[in-house]
């Protein structure tokens, strides 16, 4: 006979119910605490984000209002150098010539089947972010093309091509007697440098235009505290030049340095008694027959000093006229604009300094680079701005662009000049 066990009744039913209630309350409390923690964390995070936004907005607002007086503000707003920096800076107008030079235009088939890397010339220039390309033969325009929404009247930036204009002004100032010679110490014109360091007395003007001054210069355009950024973006470039530091003996080695042209600019304005822009206009830009107004960037409205290393702007055809002048021994027609002796001094490799850069054997002389392999010389600026002079075939090539377009233009311009020479002799 089957039997069943009697199930023992819960002797403490109230205790079980209490435990369940306590567990539920604990779970609810835990959930409530977690929600509070999440809510507090989210509020704190949002407050921090809002604070950072307000700080950034405040810093940006301060920088925007301080753009004419603060290097740090320019670093925040502008960042590094750009090919169209001329749009950011105040400038002085460099007026066009009263007697502009217009080159004769020759209709030629030289460029009809001219190709580079299998592409037609125009296609290649467009693809490499070129904005202007000019070929002069003697006094005749063989090729003039504009690309990527540029035009004949468009403003092109010199960038460091400006240095070649600056050295030319030094040659003219020596010829006019404003400067005695390149062997004068820079302290003859800027004596306050001696208060900074007595060794400045050993630095000559020649050292400054040969890039052998021995001054410190660190290249890092993205760093607003680097020498590179200071010399191109300072709102007081005279003071920046006076803060330059000697790190090695002058005359011993080439070291590309943008403090050098700043000091040259101070020498020019003190020696001539006028702004460097006015000296450019009256002694070079106008006399060489510039067709359009140019300009020279200023460090700031308050300081009013030219950006000596980079800041000349104008039409591509007028930049070509500097190369044309040098091709003709410093003459614009019958007028001797640049002393012939200066042109010879600049373009002879005998006294040049080896730079140790580039695929060609490049030498530096008075802010020009000598392409020894092709017996040519050129002015070069950042983002591949070029005035390339090839005397053997009486050629001047000018290239402007927003960047290099992945091309080694020094070598390519030499190759183009050689190919044009070959085609002209057919």
Q: Locations of the language-model features?
A:
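Active-site SXXK
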Residues: 139, 157-182, 208, 264-268, ...
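Active-site helix/loop module of the DD-peptidase/beta-lactamase fold
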Residues: 176-215, 243, 270-309, 314
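Short, small/polar residue-rich loop motifs at catalytic or cofactor-binding pockets
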Residues: 127-130, 154, 382-383
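Short, charged, amphipathic alpha-helices and their helix-cap/turn boundaries
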Residues: 140-145, 187-188, 222-250, 274-293
């Amino acid at each position: 006979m089957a039997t069943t066990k009697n199930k023992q009744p819960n002797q403490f039913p109230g205790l079980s119910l209490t435990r369940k209630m306590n567990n539920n309350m604990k779970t609810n409390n835990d959930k409530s605490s977690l929600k509070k923690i999440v809510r507090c964390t989210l509020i704190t995070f949002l407050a921090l984000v809002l604070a950072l936004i307000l700080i950034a907005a405040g810093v940006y607002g301060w920088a925007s209002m301080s753009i004419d007086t603060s290097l740090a503000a320019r670093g925040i707003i502008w960042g590094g150098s750009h090919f169209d920096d001329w749009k950011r800076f105040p400038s002085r107008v460099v007026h066009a010539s009263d007697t502009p030079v217009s080159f004769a235009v020759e209709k030629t088939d030289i460029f009809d089947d001219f190709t580079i890397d299998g592409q037609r010339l125009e296609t290649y220039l467009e693809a490499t972010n070129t904005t202007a390309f000019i070929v002069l033969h003697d006094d005749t325009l063989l090729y003039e093309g504009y690309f990527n929404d540029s035009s004949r009247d468009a403003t092109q930036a010199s960038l460091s091509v400006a240095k070649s204009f600056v050295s030319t002004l030094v040659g003219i100032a020596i010829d006019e007697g404003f400067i005695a010679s390149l062997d004068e110490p820079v302290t003859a014109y800027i004596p306050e440098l001696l208060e900074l360091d007595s060794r400045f007395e050993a630095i000559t003007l020649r050292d400054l235009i040969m890039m052998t001054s021995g001054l410190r210069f660190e290249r890092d355009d993205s760093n607003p505290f680097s020498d590179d950024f200071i010399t191109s973006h300072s709102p007081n470039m005279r003071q920046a030049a006076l803060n330059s530091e000697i790190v090695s003996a002058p005359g011993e080695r080439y070291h590309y340095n943008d403090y050098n042209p700043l000091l040259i600019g101070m020498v020019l304005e003190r020696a001539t008694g006028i702004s460097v822009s006015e000296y450019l206009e009256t002694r070079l830009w106008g006399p060489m027959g510039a067709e359009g107004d140019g300009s020279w960037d200023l460090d700031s409205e308050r300081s009013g000093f030219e950006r000596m290393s980079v800041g000349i702007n104008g039409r591509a055809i007028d930049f070509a006229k500097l190369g044309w002048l040098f091709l003709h021994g410093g003459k614009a027609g019958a007028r001797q604009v640049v002393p012939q002796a200066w042109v010879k001094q600049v373009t002879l490799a005998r006294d040049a300094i080896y730079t140790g850069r580039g695929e060609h054997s490049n030498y530096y002389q008075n802010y020009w680079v000598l392409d020894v392999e092709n017996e040519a010389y050129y002015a070069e600026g950042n983002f591949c701005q070029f005035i390339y002079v090839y005397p053997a075939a009486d050629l001047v090539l000018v290239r402007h662009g927003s960047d290099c377009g992945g091309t080694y233009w020094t070598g390519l311009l030499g190759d183009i000049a050689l190919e044009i020479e070959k085609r002209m002799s057919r």
